[in-house]
Amino acid sequence: MYVYDEHDRQMAAERVAQFRDQTERALAGELAEDEFLPLRLQNGLYVQRLAPMLRICVPYGMMRSDQLRRLARITRDYDKGYAHFTTRQNVQLNWPALEDVPDILAELAEVEMHANQTSGNCIRNTTTDQFSGVQSDEIADPRPYCEIIRQWSTFHPEFAFLPRKFKVAVNASEQTDRAAIQVHDIGLQMVRNEAGDLGFRVHVGGGLGRTPMVGPVIRDFLPELDLLT
């Protein structure tokens, strides 16, 4: 599990301060709704039927105990005492007050959590098997590769305003697809070639939206070093 360094902590604090200023300007009428919309979406904030909804990032479904306790306290202090775990392994608060969201993000930053790029047309949280790292049938632990994708895609300027949201999943089991990779925009199945080298079988174009589709294989073996290329 990735641990913040000083650069990460500083960037998280600056991001919270920036959004606090944007929220205050929006509440004061200095930012129009169409101006505030892309700013709040980049920080995980939706407004549904006049009620804000905040989606909090849980990278590849992993949380420490202190993070879970902080989430529990936030739901008690700022919401209705409960939260919603999503199919992309994130957490949603459905009743926060708009003016409280910067404070929520500040509290999340204290335990190395955020809501960046959990909403809007960007690369969403990369998901994997909920039992990754402990399954006996894994080819290798998929979580480091999910983290590589997360670091590469977060704040990448080319991925901030995509035509639609984009979803990636990684599966490491040879027997069972526990990450549902064939219904993702990119699905990566970890495999080994005849020489024993680690790589990925690549599925693309899957989805469960308006026109459901099983993603076909476009490459049987992609070397792990070429994952981002």
What are these regions (language model features)?
Residues M1-L54, D66-R70, I74, Y78, ...:
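Iron-sulfur (Fe-S) cluster-binding modules
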Residues E24-L31, A51-D197:
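Small-residue-enriched alpha-helical segments and adjacent helix-cap loops
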Residues T118, H203-G205:
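Non-cysteine beta-strand/loop elements that form the S-adenosyl-L-methionine
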Residues G205-T211:
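Short connector loops/turns at beta-strand edges and beta->alpha or beta->beta junctions
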